[in-house]
């Protein structure tokens, strides 16, 4: 609900794409508020679609059902802006390799800052990508699994 009300601060800096079903009413509200918004209800190649974007918002409030999508975004070089639940147990650090927010005010501050400091956030996204390959890579995880049986 926050973004339609903050349109004047953000709408000229972002093109927003919603992936998946169930976003229709929010897409309409965002368009009515002046945002450039699209919805892709089904992507035949999810990873290819993710790679077309720069930032992924992960406002997960409870549960871990989309944790894989957070890892997909990070490993493909997107800046992830998410809640503590979204980033829980992922080897990233707030302000270094991702942006973690705890309130709508923190989210708005980050979204307002990103267009004015693009290079800073590009570096952050790259550090997130590197962290995922280093800490969550197949080789490291499989070695840890093998070590359990030694």
Predicted regions and their residues:
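Conserved catalytic-core segment of nucleotide-activated headgroup transferases in glycan assembly
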Residues: 1-33, 39-52
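A structural motif in glycosyltransferase catalytic domains
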Residues: 1-3, 16, 73, 107, ...
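Cofactor-binding loop segments of dinucleotide-utilizing enzymes, especially the Rossmann-like FAD-
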Residues: 21, 83, 103
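Acidic donor-binding loop of glycosyltransferase active sites
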Residues: 51-65, 76-78
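Short hydrophobic beta-strand element within catalytic cores of glycosyltransferases
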Residues: 69-72, 79-83
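Short acidic/histidine- and often glycine-rich active-site loop of Leloir-type glycosyltransferases
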Residues: 84-100
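Conserved acidic donor-binding segment of nucleotide-sugar-dependent glycosyltransferases
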Residues: 97-105, 113-118
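A charged, aromatic-enriched C-terminal amphipathic alpha-helix characteristic of glycosyltransferases
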Residues: 119-149
């Amino acid at each position: 609900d926050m973004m339609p009300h903050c349109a004047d601060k953000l709408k000229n800096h972002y093109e927003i794409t919603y992936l998946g079903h169930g976003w229709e009413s929010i897409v309409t509200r965002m368009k009515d508020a002046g945002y450039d918004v699209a919805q892709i209800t089904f992507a035949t190649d999810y990873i290819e679609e993710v790679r077309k974007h720069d930032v992924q918002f992960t406002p997960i409030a409870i549960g871990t059902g989309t944790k894989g999508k957070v890892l997909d975004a990070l490993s493909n070089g997107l800046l992830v802006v998410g809640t503590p639940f979204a980033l829980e147990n992922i080897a990233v650090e707030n302000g270094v390799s991702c942006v973690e927010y705890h309130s709508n005010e923190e989210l708005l501050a980050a979204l307002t800052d990103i267009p004015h400091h693009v290079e800073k956030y590009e570096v952050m996204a790259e550090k997130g990508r590197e962290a995922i390959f280093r800490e969550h890579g197949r080789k490291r995880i499989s070695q840890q699994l093998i070590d359990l049986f030694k």
